[in-house]
Amino acid sequence: MFPQNGAKVPEIRFNGFTHDWEQRKFSDIASRESISRESSYDLPSLEYEDVIAEEGRLNKDISLKENIKKGIVFDGSQVLYGKLRPYLHNWLNPDFSGVAVGDWWVLKPNNADKSFIYRLIQTQRFDDIANQSAGSKMPRADWNLVSNTEFAVPVSQEEQEKIGEYFSSLDHLITLHQRHTDFYKKTSCYFISS
């Protein structure tokens, strides 16, 4: 669904889209938010430990957290990318408001679809760039490098939306199947131990 090896279009594509994708700097399709504030009941804090790495899902109900922490405000219209140790693949596509505590980039889409940006930050190309980082013990992705890197982007926002929706549907199916698998494992263990 993303162009490979310098191609102008991906090998697999939705019907009705024929235009070449264009090369755009990341800073042209997403900008970093920087408004900081303390967390509260209405704006729960979100930390690295709250997100399942490589899955982009919360591992707890963060609205139940009581500690007050300062971080970057997000309102659900942005994508979160963990810049600390980018090889850990911490990312989140929130549909709620909160405060991103720690080393998160809060990425606001600029003339681009939020779900597409969320998928773009998971590509191998983005990962390769983000991991060209400074620091050996605590490497961090370099915004200057990432923001000035060009990525292939569909001209049509409708195509961006379809790509985002497609991968969101796949994630949903995977989660459902994982829940079923977990249920059957627990059931099996119960019967074996009985």
What are these regions, as identified by a protein language model?
Residues 1-194:
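Feature detects amphipathic, helix-rich regulatory segments
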